[in-house]
Amino acid sequence: MSEEQKLVISSARRKTARATCYIYAGKGRVFVNNVPIELIPIEMVRLKIMEPLLLAGNDIRSKIDAKIITYGGGIMGQADAARMALARALVKFTGSKELEKIYRAYDRTMLAGDPRQTESEKWMRYSARRWRQKSYR
């Protein structure tokens, strides 16, 4: 009979992007959509997703494995959603109030989220706010 492994599942949203993070005991590996984080080509996206682990410290990072599944939205929206899901899962996995305070002091949106959405396009307009120029003569 095998030992039961501790698994924490957390999800987050940013704009139209969604992310789900699974954290379990491991060796410090992080996978985003079944690809190791080291192989993600855009460095800014890679660093944004790794922020919660860098703030948590090497002692926590080396003891866990994380699997993040993202879908919807664009690249940066998915990165923000993955970052938020990872931070929430780390706080839940460790049960540390100190880690939560570190995240809130660094960036509140790491745990709380960002409710801003793109304004939809209106009828007879080019975009959400732009209207045809009015001519008086």
From Swiss-Prot:
Signal peptide: none annotated. InterPro entries: Ribosomal_Su5_D2-typ_SF (IPR020568), Ribosomal_uS9 (IPR000754), Ribosomal_uS9_archaeal (IPR019958), Ribosomal_uS9_CS (IPR020574), Ribsml_uS5_D2-typ_fold_subgr (IPR014721). One of its GO terms (molecular function) is structural constituent of ribosome. One of its GO terms (biological process) is translation. Keywords: Ribonucleoprotein, Ribosomal protein. GO terms for cellular component: cytosolic small ribosomal subunit. HAMAP family: Ribosomal_uS9_A. Belongs to the universal ribosomal protein uS9 family. This is Small ribosomal subunit protein uS9.
